[in-house]
């Protein structure tokens, strides 16, 4: 099952530093997800100045419980980078200029 995550970073004065400090662990954690095909697409949400203020994630898990289990281990969650996360079921239609089944 595919999911769309829209995750907003905190807006406190330490938010940017928290993201920077945790970013390496975040990428180490998502690398196996990419290799297993669970992470279909992802990237940072930017403000008008080009600063990272959140993330968009298109992920594929067998069910919502498995997605929730991943979030309990995701460094951006455990270290307080993402403060507000919207999660919606999603069906990917186009990826890299190709229509997906």
Question: Where is each model-derived feature located?
Answer:
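Conserved, structured core segments of small domains
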Residues: 1-101
